[in-house]
């Protein structure tokens, strides 16, 4: 009985030992795998899970169709509509087949997953069975664990004993070597002090180098902007930025502690500096971030450089403007000399202008030959003096009219040289054309002066005949009464003559300005002929209707009243109409109207006949005594500018001057109010357009 109890106790002890040693339990993975399969079975047993699965299949299939464009929507919609109209059952069957295919595929995937999990479970169970057969009894395991623990404790003790021996030896060495270590520590401290100093010097050198590099890059950018400037300014720009680094070195020596404190923000300051100078591109990364003094100082230096550049630019612009002004003055002097010389040869003449000048000279020579004999007999020095003065005044008008064309230097520095060359060429071309205009005007003036001299000679011959008759006849008291209204008429006519002379000079200035501004455009060869015809138009104004000068003397005293009324009407006429008439004649007069000069000879013959037929009354004698020759000339010009000239018919194109032309013209001339900035020649009237074409 005792043996049985012992065996029973032994068996009980073995079971306890087995439990304490934990004979290898099955892995938790197996339990999880079993639970997953159980969960799948439980979930799919409910119908809600199946509904969710179907919904997911539909949604993700739709996503796949949209993402990968698996369906042609147009064909699909058209075919589906046709199929629904024809065979709705076929559509339903096709849809069912497609859905069943999807469902079968999904179930096949699930079955594969589940079957693979079942295979893994079987393999794990087989491995556990094999391990259970090989396992050792638990008593042997206990012994093995105890032996391993003892082996681990022994090497730890050995390591501790070795460490204690080493510590003792180190303690002895410390006691012996305390004094020499102190000296070594002093040396090490000195070396450490020297090393940070060298480091600081190296840092300062790096800072200086980086600053110099940034300055050089800034200089290069400046040079790219200053390529078109003159060399001295570039030299100044090179000298100026070299000064700041010395001051910066001093600041670096004075402020080393500040750098050490603010090294945290060095990289930020470096990036800001690089973006300010424009060196760093978005793809690059800074290799050496040098700490600058403060973020404000480089910006200040750049602003100072920009201010210096602006000052230098201003100086250079002033120099350029002064040089261009000097050149323009020299060109003006040359052009004036050419106009004074007048008849010198000029290379820029086109052949047609030469032909027209030759025609003018031949016409003038023919007129001179016909009328030299009459004019030589009747010339007097008193008549020649005021005419010379008139010539000088007209030449003075010509010269300032030529000067106003100036080429102002443009603000952009890039185009200065090109503009200067263009200005020289344009001024040379303009000077040649101005000289041509000056020559033509002088020739026209000489023709006018000869006609005036002839008229004055005729009047002087009439005066001589009258003086001979005066000596024979006596003076009467009634003549004195008639003198007074005539003298008043003459006094009134003097300011009118002056006003008309001023108006004529201003009109000529306007026409010359227009002629000067036009050479910039491309001028066809036909236009110089028109210009000469226009200049011929001036004498035709003054030569029209010279008859009233000779007929005015023998008239009854009523003629004096008529003259007074005419002068009053003239004074009331606004100056704008006179300007318009002169302007219209010069611009819009056609070459068909010009040959009025050819009628001068018969007009002069009529003057002679009128002077012979006129009765020699006492009034005429007294007038010829008291009135000087210059007043007679003024009366002639008054008669020429009488309102009879204004009553002549005006062509349609001279009448219409509208700002916005609407296709209908007025019977009377309408002048737009000219603004001071506008050129009077640039009116958009249809008449001018047709004439220019």
Curated annotation (Swiss-Prot):
Residues 117-260, 278-649, 666-693 are annotated as: Disordered. GO terms for biological process: establishment of localization in cell; heart contraction; release of sequestered calcium ion into cytosol by sarcoplasmic reticulum; response to bacterium. The keyword Transmembrane helix applies. Detected in heart (at protein level). Detected in heart. Residues 354-364, 672-693 have a biased composition (Polar residues). Keywords: Disulfide bond, Glycoprotein, Membrane, Phosphoprotein, Sarcoplasmic reticulum, Transmembrane, Transmembrane helix. Disruption phenotype: Mice appear normal; they are viable and fertile but have reduced muscular strength, due to defects in the structure of the triad junction, where T-tubules and the sarcoplasmic reticulum terminal cisternae are in close contact. In mutant mice, about 25% of the triads are in oblique or longitudinal orientation, instead of the normal transversal orientation. Similar structural defects are seen in the heart, leading to impaired excitation-contraction coupling. Mutant mice are subject to stress-induced ventricular tachycardia. Its main location: membrane. Contributes to the regulation of lumenal Ca2+ release via the sarcoplasmic reticulum calcium release channels RYR1 and RYR2, a key step in triggering skeletal and heart muscle contraction. Required for normal organization of the triad junction, where T-tubules and the sarcoplasmic reticulum terminal cisternae are in close contact. Required for normal skeletal muscle strength. Plays a role in excitation-contraction coupling in the heart and in regulating the rate of heart beats. This is Triadin. It comes from Mus musculus.
